[in-house]
Amino acid sequence: MKPSFYDLSYADLERVVNQHNLNHSAATVLFNWHYKKKEMAVCQDKLAKSALAFFKDSFDFSLPEIDTVHESTKDRTVKFLFKLKDSHKIETVLIPFNNKYSICLSSQVGCAMNCSFCFTGKQGLKRNLTTSEIVGQFIQAWRWLAANRPGEERILNIVFMGQGEPLHNFDAVKKACEIFLSKHGTSVGVQKITVSTAGYIPGLERWSLETPGVNLALSLHSPFAEKRNELIPINKKYPLDEVLAYIDKIPLQKKQFITYEYILIKDFNDTADDAKKLGALLAGKSAYINLIPFNSFPGSHYQCPDLDKVEQFKEVLDTFKIPTLIRGAKGDDVLAACGQLNSKN
């Protein structure tokens, strides 16, 4: 089986070009063709016949296949079900804002974290995604926009908040970020990429050393150990105080912050005491809080709190001077909102 072209970073591709004595411009031409122009066929642009033949013979240029597309009638969110070569499936979401998009990428088939508020966790972990399967979600979504919503094919933000724990698949996610950031590739700004984690410390140990500048988001969801243990079982192995200690060591750029995600669940973690404890925990940090009213999915016993309760929770956090946003549900009518992805359904 041929290796995938889309598993190569620009540095990897330069090494291949040099090892096979190809024209030094071949790496730039190929990246420009496949990532800036996002062409499907092997590069035909300014590439010598010998180089073209080499790459055709040496690499696989296929991408994950779009199996199904679900479009929200409420807010134009788009959810893709991708079929991989081994018949596993993953989901990816395009979230619209002002004719531009954020893309929510998956990093694994299923997830090992088993978070109780997340539909993906019910699948268990099947396997990690390759870099090409991660990058392929972006390229295929962009192509779909170009074909189906011409003039709107601007994906400005990349968030690793789909299926899987990104830091549990660190190497593939890291290389995907390198491709997205490359000036020869998609050239996404470093502040436009966010990687979310449940608090997987082995990945956090590598984070600041190997992915400087890329934004980090922590799925926090409760400042109380007992509640967080129920929501995020990995908290028993990697307690929140240890996770925060690692995060506090991450050097941040000017005006950069850590995002803390907080799913609000009715009569569970939505009280004033929860808010006060959360505020005290994060006060004085370079923190930004996303409050996410729970999005229901089949089989869950959790419920979403009333909007008044959500706003009261935010008001408590405001007293701690922590920037806080109540995130509206997008795509929940097609199970595309936060916590609703499940490629078995």
Where do the language-model regions lie?
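Auxiliary Fe-S-binding modules of radical SAM enzymes
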Residues: M1-I90, P150, D248-F257, Y262-N345
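Generic beta-strand structural signal
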Residues: V78, I90, Y101-L105, M113, ...
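Short linear Ser/Thr-Pro motifs
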Residues: S72-T73, S106-S107, S196, S219
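Conserved AdoMet/S-adenosylmethionine-binding subsite of the radical SAM
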Residues: R143-I322
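P-loop NTP-binding catalytic core
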Residues: D86-I95, N99-K100
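Alpha-helix N-cap/helix-start and coil->helix boundary motif
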Residues: Y10, A112, Y200-P202, A225, ...
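Canonical Radical SAM [4Fe-4S] cluster-binding loop centered on the CxxxCxxC motif
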Residues: P96-W142
